Curated annotation (Swiss-Prot):
GO terms for biological process: microtubule-dependent intracellular transport of viral material towards nucleus; symbiont entry into host cell; viral penetration into host nucleus. Self assembles to form an icosahedral capsid. Most capsid appear to be large particles with an icosahedral symmetry of T=4 and consist of 240 copies of capsid protein, though a fraction forms smaller T=3 particles consisting of 180 capsid proteins. Entering capsid are transported along microtubules to the nucleus. Phosphorylation of the capsid is thought to induce exposure of nuclear localization signal in the C-terminal portion of the capsid protein that allows binding to the nuclear pore complex via the importin (karyopherin-) alpha and beta. GO terms for cellular component: host cell; host cell cytoplasm; T=4 icosahedral viral capsid. This is Capsid protein. It comes from Duck hepatitis B virus (isolate brown Shanghai duck S5). Keywords: Capsid protein, Cytoplasmic inwards viral transport, DNA-binding, Host cytoplasm, Host-virus interaction, Microtubular inwards viral transport, Phosphoprotein, RNA-binding, T=4 icosahedral capsid protein, Viral penetration into host nucleus, Virion, Virus entry into host cell. Residues 183-262 are annotated as: Disordered. SUPFAM superfamilies: Hepatitis B viral capsid (hbcag) (SSF47852).
Length: 262
């Protein structure tokens, strides 16, 4: 990956959350884009990475949705006087990356006890589920952005997606009164430029060479007695006879020559 594409990929994390499709729509669009490559058993980089994130997102998404459903169902059995665990006592995504997966439950339980030692068991389970679901959602968000990048590189080409991210970032960072009303779209960037017809006349046939050519003098000719005669050389008055008709004989030619037989 060249430096421009690497920079554009890093900028994907800074794009607004609502720029990306919802998880269900994203996975469906990605599968549609990947299907031709799956049929041909392609091993392109973008195909392999996008396939990995499709599987990862589907598994994480289902697990996260299940956590939310169980947590909501536990609300009915939590004592109404129980205060929710403050956000500061819940493990955040950045902290979870530094903690081994097997120790995640232990660290979260210690924080809940430090908040309230006799915290009800149902409320503890609810707090655990909410913390893990939040961690999963942030991981899903990162995976969602990466999946969007890789399957769009398959659809539009890595260079076009890189150019699009650069233009979109420029548009977002420009004050509203100095930028266009609508954000740039990748469809508009990749659309071929059409030249208006009729603006210039096109000549068919052989192409004339460039540069100046010496002008050739045109010599007008006429035909007299089947021969070509240059008008530039003969400036005499025109004959009343038509071209190609016999000229009248002179008076001396009217006398018939004696026959050689006499």
């Amino acid at each position: 990956m060249d430096i421009n594409a690497s920079r554009a990929l890093a900028n994907v994390y800074d794009l607004p959350d609502d720029f990306f499709p919802k998880i269900d729509d994203l996975v469906r669009d990605a599968k549609d884009a990947l299907e031709p490559y799956w049929k041909s058993d392609s091993i392109k980089k973008h195909v392999l990475i996008a396939t990995h994130f499709v599987d990862l997102i589907e598994d994480f998404w289902q697990t996260t949705q299940g956590m939310h459903e169980i947590a909501e169902s536990l609300r009915a059995v939590i004592p109404p006087t129980t205060a929710p665990v403050p956000t500061g006592y819940l493990i955040q995504h950045e902290e979870a990356e530094e903690i081994p997966l097997g120790d995640l439950f232990k660290h979260q339980e210690e924080r809940i006890v430090s908040f309230q030692p006799d915290y009800p068991i149902t409320a503890r389970i609810h707090a655990h589920l909410k913390a893990y679901a939040k961690i999963n959602e942030e991981s899903l968000d990162r995976a969602r952005r990466l999946l969007w990048w890789h399957y769009n590189c398959l659809l539009w080409g890595e260079a076009n997606v890189t150019n699009y991210i650069s233009r979109l970032r420029t548009w977002l960072s420009t004050p509203e009164k100095y930028r266009g009303r609508d954000a740039p779209t990748i469809e508009a960037i990749t659309r071929p430029i059409q030249v208006a017809q009729g603006g210039r006349k096109t000549s068919s046939g052989t192409r004339k060479p460039r540069g100046l050519e010496p002008r050739r003098r045109k010599v007008k000719t006429t035909v007299v007695y089947g021969r070509r005669r240059s008008k530039s050389r003969d400036r005499r008055a025109p004959s009343p006879q038509r071209a190609g008709s016999p000229l009248p004989r002179s008076s001396s030619s009217h006398h018939r020559s004696p026959s050689p037989r006499k």
